[in-house]
Each structure stands twice: as structure tokens, then as C-alpha cells.
Amino acid sequence: MNAQVSTTAPTAGSAQLTLRRLIIYALLFALVVIGAVGLSGLVERLLGTGVVVASNDVAGLARSLAFTLIGGPLAAVLWWVVWKRLDDPAERASAGWGLYLAGVYAVSLIVSVTALLGMAASFIGAREPRWSSPLSVGLAWAGIWIWHRWMWRHPVKHPAHLDDVPAVIGSVFGLLVGTVAAISALGGLLDVAIRGDTSLTPWVETWWQPVLRALVWAVGGSTVWWWHWFRGGGRKLRTALVDVALIGVGIFAAGITALAGAGVVVFVLLRMAFDRDGPMSELLGPLGPALAAAAVGSLVWRYHRVSGAHRSVATRRASQLVTSGVALAAAASGIGVIINATLAIAVSPLAGGGTRTLLLGGISSLAVGGPVWWQAWKPGRQPQTAETIPPGRRVYLIVFFGISAVVALIALLVIGFRIFEYLLGNVTGGSLLDRVRAPLGLLVAAGLVSAYHFALWRREHALLVAASPAQAHTIRQVTSRWWQPPTRTCCPRPSPAPPAPKSRYGEGPTRAPRRRRRKAFRHGNLSWSGGYLTHSPASQPRTSCW
């Protein structure tokens, strides 16, 4: 009874402590958000020029006052209690403290930066910019961000765990905002340079105003990324979260952007050469944004590829595999589209420009993704021994084999549905091949990818099996003290034991003498030595007894 109480009491106490921390930090998060919303509403009313504070929006003013005067003091009191508890190392090491800081840091950073950049961009080309509302929101949440950044960087009370989350959040957010805005600004500028000013209302908004607004967002996002990546020390962190963010955003997302932009550029050039249906201005419409996406995406991808080269071996291998996967997806999509368009031309040789455009799209996707995949994967230099197979390579092969197999299965089901629908129903218009050409192209592309990766996996699995040392069939089980070897069926039974001797102290028999334990023996393919029973195959069958 006492032992059970002593073992369950710490578990119950730990669960209650974790629940208490969770409730406290969740309540503090809610109160901080409530106080910031109320404060931003009051500041907006104070900054509004020519606006009465109460005006007609009594409910809005009452809400702002309640949030500020009730939620704000409660948040301050609860924060003071939490701050005093952080003198205990166990409180600083709890996951709740790190999650709270990361959550409020992310929300305050995103809201404040978005509001301030929106306010700055609203002054460009606007006759009456509405700056009071975004400025009040930006100031209130910027104060929350500065406060929590100070706690995150505190020399003593900073979180012991998840201390890299704010740097990662700031870097990823700034990189995404800066990249998207840079593509928009450069794309607008290139579009004007290629096609000229095509605005229908030039007297309302000139061509340079949206470019300049996008440039403001690009500069703001790049500043946030630089502050967290360089000044905040995110580049020097060697944690799994930083590696995942670097690969997921800097390699995967940037690679998709660069390949998509390059594919559209090749597609437009092919259409200019072989498919000039329609006005030239409409044909050149996607060229400017595509060039911008290819340029900015390639720049971001190249920087993170070089930055990942100074990290661990696993990070470098993962970045290479991710690049190969993105390029392979583009190339496989191109193969499927080419098969689809080829079947459409075979069904109707007099097909219009739509089929030709589809074929050019598939060729452009294959022309962009194929060389990048060949350079990243290097199919001519595959591992020849088990020692040269990277650990994550087999996971990559299994993932691509599984995904492509699922896609092929879905395409096969769609083909079967179209065939039975054509045979059983009164379907008019279009042949059977015309109905199944799209899923058939997808099936062929997915089948090729699945078969290739499965063949590689089988080959590398055989190399690993051949290189693994042969293991003896050993039964890891220690027998009892009085364990006896198996009964010998080919030998005569031993004679019965003699009667037990009489004890000299009484009429009863004495205790049987202790039987000596055999240290080793062998019986056929079984051998006993050192407390282990081992089975080893025999070269010749044994006919005699042991």
C-alpha cells in the first residue's frame, strides 16, 4: 500500500503542475491579446483628426475601454505572478513558458509589421490615406513585441526550451513577405518594360504606384528577415527547427517558385515561336511576373543552398533530396501533359490551338524540371556499395514510390470509370480515347516514377542485406538452475535411483545431494555454454547420441 502511494503521488503532482501551467499561460495569452486590442482601439480614436472620441460608436468605445481598463490590469497582475515564479529553474524549463513567448511573439510581430507596412504603402498614390487605424494597431502590437522580445532575450529568465522559435518565426515571416513583395514589384516593372503601360485608367493610378507600394513591402519584409536571421542569431543556431525552416522555405518553397517561373518563361517563348494565336500583348502578359518569380526564387534558393552547405551532413543531403523531388515532380507533370496532348492530336489531327498550347506547356515543364532533376539526383552516379548509401535516401525513395503509386491507382480508377461510363451509358460526343487521355497520361507518368524508385529501392536493399554480417541463431534466454538437457530417445533409459539414505538424526531421509550443473554440452544442432542455448546448422546429420 505504501509503495503504491509513493509511486503514484509524484505522477499526480506532475500532471497537476503541468495543467496549472497550461491554464495560467493560456489565460495570460488571452489577457494580453484583449489588452492590446482595447489599447489599439483607444489610440485610434485619439489619433483620428476631426473625430469626436465618443461619436456615434458608443459600443466600440465601451468595448475598447473594457478591454483596456479590465483586461490590461489583469494581464499585468498575472504577468507579475508568472515573472516571479520564473526564478525557479523548473518554471523556466517548462514547455508552457516557451510556447507562450513564441505564440505572443509571432502574433505581435505579424500584426504590427503588417499594420505599419500597410500604413506606409497607403500614402503612395492615395489622396486621403487612412493612417490612424493601422498606426494605432501597429503601435500597440509593436509595444507587445518589444516587451516579449526583452523577455525572450533576458539573461536569466529566458526559456530553457523552444528558445529558437521566435528567431525562426521572424525569419520565415520576413522572408515570405519580402519574397512575395519583391516578385510583385519586379514583375510589375518588367511587365511595363516588355508591354508598356497597359493601364485602362492612367489618370487614376499610374504604373509606378503599385510597383512602389510592393517595394515598400519588400523592404519591410527583408528588414524583418535580416533582423532575425543575422542580428537575432538565427543563422548561428544549429537546431532541428532551424534546419526544417531552412529546407522547407528556403529550398522547397523557393525551388517551386523558381521552377514555376522558369517554366512559364519557356512556355511563353515556345508560344511566341509556334503558337501565335491572339494578340501579342496578351501573349506576353505572363512573361514579366514569370521572369520576376524565376529570378527572385532562384536567388533565395541559391542563398539557402549555400547557407545549408555549412551545416550538418544530414541538412545538406536533405536539401539536395528536396531539390531533386521538386524538379522530378515538374518533369513528371510535363510527361503526363505531353502524353495527354499527343493523344488529343491523335484523336483529332485537326485540333485547334488549345491542344497545341497544352503540348507546349508539357514540353516547357519537362524542359525545366528534367535538367534540374538530372543535376540534383545524378542518375549516372548511383551508390554502388552499402557504405555509400546516405541514410535519408531510402526514405526519399519510399516516399516517392508511395506517392506515385497512389496517384497511379487514382488515375487507373478514373480510367476504369470512364470506360464503364462509355460502355454502359448513352454517351455522345467524343471517343473513348478522348475521354481517358488525361488520366492515361497521369497514369503513365506516375507509373514510370513509381517503377524507377521501386527498382532503386530494391537494388539498394539488396546491397544492404549483402553487406550485413550473418548473425547466429542464438536463443537469449537463461534457463533455471535445475534445467536438464533434452531426453535422449536413442539411448537406454538410466537405471532407477537407489533409495535415499537414512538420516543419522532421525528416521526421515536426508536431503538429496545437490546435482552438479553441467557447464557445457552439445546435442545435435543444440549447444549449451555460458548460460545460452545456441542453434547452429550441422554440416552432416548426427546419428549417434551426445
Where do the model's predicted regions map?
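Hydrophobic/aromatic interaction determinants used to assemble and anchor large protein complexes
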Residues: 1-411, 416-486, 490-500, 504-513, ...
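N-terminal beta-loop-helix "entrance" segment that forms/cooperates
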Residues: 512-520
